[in-house]
């Protein structure tokens, strides 16, 4: 999927959403690092956050791509600035067939409609592969994520606890028809 974005300065910029390639692993790791620090600083204990980020370096992403994980990237002027991962729902007790596992953008690209574009691309691919309905989990304290998925029409269907070191945080599942 390729589209043009019109900036207020009247400059057109090409964005592309496409399947990740192994050569994207380094940039995806950089997006992951920046987005997680921005989204979870103060929500996930510092040591746990650093541990989680460090596990997802370029080698981890290269392996995910080589395994055939469903992973789309948003390419903005030939730079990866966002990604989304998705597949079969991991919680069988929920009726949704699919799941968006992660959707992240570089912090400076949030609020520009790029997250919606990644979401819609993942939604369309899930539907094309037999997953017409899906869920997305977000930390309950992550107000931006909660607002984003609510704005897109998600309905809160489940709350669960997730442990980060010695602390627990609530996470919320949003269902999309």
What are these model-predicted stretches?
Residues 106-108, 112, 140-141:
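Active-site acidic-Proline motif in GNAT/NAT acetyltransferases
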Residues 2-7, 11, 170-177:
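Terminal substrate-recognition subdomain of acyl/acetyltransferases
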Residues 15, 19-25, 30-108, 116-121, ...:
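Acetyl-CoA-dependent GNAT
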Residues 114, 131, 154:
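Short phosphate-binding/catalytic loops that engage adenosine nucleotides
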Residues 31, 129, 151-152:
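Structural motif
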Residues 127-137:
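Conserved GNAT acetyl-CoA-binding A-motif
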Residues 136-145, 163-168:
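Conserved beta-strand-loop-alpha-helix junction that forms the acyl-donor binding cleft
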């Amino acid at each position: 999927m390729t589209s043009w974005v019109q900036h207020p300065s009247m400059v057109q910029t090409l964005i592309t959403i496409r399947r990740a390639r192994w050569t994207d692993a380094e940039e995806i790791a950089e997006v992951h690092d920046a987005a997680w620090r921005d989204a979870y600083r103060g929500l996930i204990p510092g040591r746990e956050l650093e541990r989680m980020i460090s596990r997802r370096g370029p080698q981890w992403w290269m392996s995910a791509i080589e395994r055939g994980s469903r992973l789309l990237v948003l390419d903005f002027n030939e730079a990866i600035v966002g990604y989304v991962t998705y597949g079969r729902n991991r919680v069988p007790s929920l009726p949704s067939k699919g799941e968006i596992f992660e959707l992240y953008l570089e912090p400076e690209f949030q609020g520009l409609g790029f997250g919606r574009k990644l979401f819609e691309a993942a939604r369309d691919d899930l539907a094309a592969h037999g997953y017409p309905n899906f869920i997305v989990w977000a930390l309950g304290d992550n107000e931006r994520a909660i607002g984003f998925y609510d704005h897109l029409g998600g309905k809160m269907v489940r709350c669960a606890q997730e442990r980060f070191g010695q602390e627990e945080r609530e996470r919320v599942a949003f269902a999309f028809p």
